[in-house]
Amino acid sequence: MRNCLVAQSGGPTVAINSSLAGVIQGAIDSKKFDKVYGSLNGVQGLLNGCLMDLTEKVEQVPMFIELLKKSPSMYLGSCRYQLPDYTEDDAPYAYIFNKFETYEIDAFFYIGGNDSMDTVDKLNTYAKAVGKDVKIVGIPKTIDNDLCITDHTPGYGSAAKYVASTLLEIGHDTSIYPINSVTIVEIMGRDAGWLTGASVLARNKYNHAPHLIYLPEVAFDEAQFIEDVREAIKKYNNVVIAVSEGIKNAEGKYISATSAVEDTFGHSQLSGTGTVSYTHLRAHE
């Protein structure tokens, strides 16, 4: 028999260790693998030779898998490493697949979001190109629910609950004042408004917040935004606005991207959408 390898990457969620537990338990139950190895800090663990025997861990700690399901953060750690195009630099790929042979790995499971799935795709493409029979499997995890062809991913539900709970508390806190107020809450979501949209769950018969919601899927119109706020203030006095970090104007340009920096995968690290929205409001007082 052969072995399998699993790694985690991206940001932590309340569910990502449950996915890891599922891989370990599933591999053991299948009886197709002698050992389940874990790569520490994502694909970088492979490049640095940092692997651990998870099968041994299960044998040493009988409750390990059950404890893992309830553990926060990421048991195997994470990374922000981007593999190069193998046609330009195949050295990391050759090293990784050499490790697969050394540890007799038949299947590699990578738990993560879009960037992790990019790594999965690159490794799978390389494997086919050089005739390596290693199964490369991506396991979805992302709190902003933006993985293609995926209805909802592990991690989104808990993040959506957090957003809704936070907006509910903000709504109650701001409603106590007799003066007009506008509170803008900027929520994660570069190109997908699922998390910001989840803020609507805060509404109930005692709380109308968030009164206004702006998503990246709909072009942001400054004039309409100002008018929306004016009408909301007339009706509610204290207005709470949920706005996605990735809202764009009619030209498709990010509202907050003027001073954005890029991460290791070339994504704009957006911030300041709330500040820009606030500036628009102050300019039309």
Regions found by a protein language model. Give the residues of each.
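Short glycine-rich or small-residue beta-strand-to-loop segments that form or flank ligand, phosphate
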Residues: 3-13, 74-79, 106-112, 138, ...
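Conserved anion/nucleotide-ligand pocket segment
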Residues: 179-214
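Short, acidic/small-residue loops that bind anionic groups at enzyme active sites
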Residues: 124-153, 157-164, 210-217
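Glycine-rich oxoanion-binding loops at beta->alpha junctions
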Residues: 51-105, 168
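Short Gly/Thr/Asp-enriched flexible loops that form oxyanion-binding sites at enzyme active sites
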Residues: 19, 23, 115-130
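N-terminal phosphate-binding or glycine-rich loops at protein starts, especially the Walker A/P-loop
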Residues: 1-51
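Oxyanion-binding "anion nests"
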Residues: 233-254
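Conserved small/polar residues in nucleotide/adenosyl-binding loops
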Residues: 279-285
